[in-house]
Amino acid sequence: MVRPTRVRYTVLALTVAAYMITYMDRVMIAAAVPVIQKEFGFSLVTMGWILSAFRWGYALFQIPGGWLGDRIGPRRALSLIVTWWSLFTSATALAWSAVSMMVFRFLFGVGEAGAFPIATRSLSRWMLPAERGFAQGITHAGSRLGAALTPALVVFLMARWGWRAPFFVFGALGLLWVAVWYGYYRDTPEEHRSVNRAERELIHSAMGGPRPRVSAAVPWREIFSSANLWTLCLMYFCYAYCISVYLDWFPKYLHDHRGFDLTRMGLYAGLPLLAGTAGDLLGGWFSDLWLKRSGNLRRARRGVAIGGFLLAAGGILPATFTADPLACVLYTCLAVFGLELTVGVSWAVPLDIASDYAGSVSSVMNMCGNIGGAISPALLAYLVRSYNWEVPFVLSSMLCLVAAALFTRIDAARRISSPGVTA
């Protein structure tokens, strides 16, 4: 008996690498904020708007990005958008004012907008349904691992060549990934020469037959009329707001409020995201294990996500009010671990409810979520200026409780019905 090849796992590994690069490019500016502020004389609020500019571009172009992946296929779509955002990653180093930096960050966000929806679409043709939670967990773990390593790497590069150097280095890394992706990936297993018959049959039997390379038409009416999807979107709004606090401002918080010097900031700022990496891996894996043992998709997705949000809410408050800076970092690790337990599950739900249109459905979710992510950096700056650093974190804890409540209403077993999607 011929054993199936394992090409789908190489596809998954390339997708993990893409997720790592998205977050490395995204969070590198956070580690450079103290140096950029000093050079340009930007206020905290101005820096907040610069950080928000990326997320507005990212949020507003989610749906076009997901649509692009569904229409032309992930191979070409990801190659195009990663090239785009890598160029604007490097362009950030050429900014000469607050406005120019906002424009470059906005255009960078436009490119990154399609990354996760298109990558989700790329996995929908390759990963077995019982592997989806793990696949989403490990890809997002890759993104958080990239983010965790970035502060120390950025500080290292800045110490030798200035704050602009990391933007050029990371931009080049993205272009290298494009060359590998376009050369190896194919939109369906049937198109890949290295996939043997046994692996094709394994994938087809799990999915009920071969799937088309691209979707003929996206059923937008059915998508936008799904109450299940809108609940998912509201939940992800809360999540994205909370995680943005840590992605965009945690290094600055440690430097200004907790008294860490630049070197210690670089070392400690990545620890919560390292804990988040473990959360991503465990959340998706445990949800899939729960599904295999119980056969109950609804409970397998809900249980993990609700537990994660409650853990996050419980970790944020002691991190905020402890007087010990190291205890603050440790409690923050617990909070981000809880937040990231929810991510693989959240991104598995679009695959569960609309696999043929996973790119479009996940883009709607990610757009709504990242409106929260776009509001977060600027609002935090205003809250800190008007009150103190504690208020934004208390707000994040409250939003975690709201997200947990919303997930009690999300049903991963309720598929979006349309002429092209079987209910």
What are these regions (language model features)?
Residues 27, 55-63, 113, 147-148, ...:
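Residue-level signature of mid-helix packing/kink "hotspots" within the transmembrane helices
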Residues 29-30, 224-281, 342-343, 347, ...:
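Extracytoplasmic gate region of multi-pass secondary transporters
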Residues 41, 73, 88, 94-100, ...:
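Helix-breaking motifs and short loop linkers at transmembrane-helix boundaries and internal kinks
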Residues 60-99:
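Conserved MFS/SLC helix-loop-helix module at the cytosolic interface between two early adjacent transmembrane helices
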Residues 76-90, 298-316:
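Structural signature of the two symmetry-related core transmembrane helices
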Residues 104-144:
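Cytoplasmic helix-loop-helix junction between adjacent transmembrane helices
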Residues 143-192:
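Helix-loop-helix hairpin linking two adjacent transmembrane segments in secondary transporters
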Residues 159-172, 261, 300-303, 382-398:
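A membrane-interface helix-boundary motif in multi-pass transporters
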